[in-house]
Amino acid sequence: MPVVVVATLTAKPESRDAVRDICTRAIEQVHSEPGCQLYSLHESADTFVFVEQWSDTDALKTHSTAPAATALFRDVAEHLAAAPDVKVLTPVGAGDPAKGRLRS
C-alpha cells in the first residue's frame, strides 16, 4: 500500500531563497529513487511543503537515509526557523475514490 508523507519546513525570513534552492536541488535525485511515486514541493511565504507518495514503507525508509534526503536536511538546517514537521499519513476512504486519495 502506498505511503503518503507531508513534510513542512519553515524558513527563516531571510533564508527563504536558500531553502527553496536547497529543496529544489534534491528533487531530481529523489524522483529517481526506487518507489518514489510523488515528490512535489509547494510554498507559501516562508513555508515549504513536500507532498510525497512512496510505493511502500521500505521505499520510504530507503529514501530517509538516501544521499538526497541526507544532504537536504543537513544543508537546510541552519536556514530553518523551527524543526521540520514530517507526518506519515494514512488515507481516509470517503467520497469518490478517484477524487478522495492520491493516485498510485
Residue locations for each model-derived region?
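Short, well-ordered beta-strand segments in beta-rich or mixed alpha/beta enzyme
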Residues: V4-T10, S40-S64
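An amphipathic, aromatic/His-enriched active-site/gating alpha helix that lines ligand/cofactor pockets
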Residues: E28-Q37, Q53-K87
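Short acidic, gly/pro-rich beta-turn/loop elements at beta-sheet edges
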Residues: D17-V19, L60-T62, D96-A98
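Generic hydrophobic secondary-structure packing signal
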Residues: V3, V19-I22, T65
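Short, surface-exposed ligand-recognition loops at beta-strand->loop->(often short) alpha-helix junctions
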Residues: T10-R20
